[in-house]
Amino acid sequence: MKRVGAHVSIAGGVENAPLQASKIGAKAFALFTKNQRQWKSPELAALSIETFRRNCCDGGFRPEHILPHDSYLINLGSPEPDKLDRSRNAFFDEMQRVERLGLKMLNFHPGSHLNQIEPDACLQLIAESVNMALDRSCCVTAVIENTAGQGTNLGRSFDDLACIIDHVEDKSRVGVCLDTCHLFAGGYDIRTKEALDRTLDEFDRIVGIRYLKAMHLNDAKQPLGSRLDRHECIGKGAIGIEAFTAIMQHPLLDELPLILETPDSDGWQEEIGLLYRLAEEQVKDVSTPP
């Protein structure tokens, strides 16, 4: 079964996230566990945690289908010692919040070398940061998100992802979330079933398909290899509808959280419906009614 959802709002408290997901017909969801634009936030209240867990249960959302995302402020490969220390502490705090919610994964962007250190040194810092967080926590898997390769951000190539994983000591608690827009912008073609198969085969050869824990489903505003992270609605960008048909029909992607981060949140319910139709049959025109 495919588990499609979206990155939903936590306005009013994290306990509202599963309610928002249910409203749009999601079978998975992503969320921030705090204000992602602040380094520190109040601890999660016991009542919020209890209500979150109950709402997840009522909505049929299991921990393996929920993908928390850390703050965009965090840079686990920062070349600046004070910012690296702050990022590591914030990342561990996010791990603790995820554990308290009873969840199993924390999705994060690898990091940026800021043109101050060599990329290999930055990758080592990222792996070291992950090791430190895993050592101080007990059950959350650190899920690395591939990037578009914009600016000095690392994690565009499968080689980058493999390098980080190779240096993570507990291989049972590290994984990857593949973002389709980032893949495409980073030079990995997924526009047809054959192209998707080739890209997944390459991922398996270099990283290992066993590490694939989730996907972000986004079309792309920019062409293949642009290195620009510009999301578009499903079927309306440069990737196209055939790619998402192939994803929705690919058996290796069953039971993974498939999370929309497309720009029109008001259209998520419609996009989720479209994706589930794609799972059943070839749809050439995104305007085709159910």
UniProtKB/Swiss-Prot annotation:
User: Which positions bind Zn(2+) 3?
Assistant: 182, 229, 231
As recorded in UniProt, its EC number(s) are 3.1.21.2
The UniProt entry, under HAMAP family, shows:
Nfo (MF_00152)
InterPro entries with a match to the protein in the record: AP_endonuc_2 (IPR001719), AP_endonuc_F2_Zn_BS (IPR018246), Xyl_isomerase-like_sf (IPR036237), Xyl_isomerase-like_TIM-brl (IPR013022)
| Pfam families hit by this protein | AP_endonuc_2
Q: Taxonomic lineage of this organism?
A: Bacteria, Pseudomonadati, Chlorobiota, Chlorobiia, Chlorobiales
Residues reported in the UniProt entry to bind Zn(2+) 1: 69, 109, 145
Descriptive protein name: Probable endonuclease 4
